[in-house]
Amino acid sequence: MNLTLYYLYWRFKLSKLYNTYLELKKKDKETIYLFKSGIFFISLDNDAYILSKLFHFKITNLTDTVVKCGFPCSSFNKYSHLFQLHHLSIKIIELENNALYSFNEYKQNQYVVDLLEFINSIDINSLSITDAYQFIEDLKNKVSKINKNGANI
């Protein structure tokens, strides 16, 4: 792919992202939208300025006219706690599957994904009886958090 086509491809992709942001803001100006893009959550335009002011995120240019800021997905738990402390209304857009989640829905989905990874990581052939009972107890505790807390994990 030559450089011009590459530039046009990214220009289209970024304008689509920004247009999605503008459409969401028309429906709900008060909510801050985070786009999950790869291993980062990014915020655009005015939302980026709000988050940058509160959490000292670095503002960078998405395009010549649109700014962004963000944080790594690995820091999600840290920032989710801070967002709640500041009573921010947050929604998350997963670009890979074009889904919009409330903040709590996203947290619950992530908890379930982590739970499934925990289950999948167990080598049942190497478990002793004691380890198996401990695994079942750990699993029971993790599942009970979903049942008790719903989305507020």
Describe the role of every protein-language-model region.
Residues 2-121, 126-138, 142-153:
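Basic, polar low-complexity surface loops/patches
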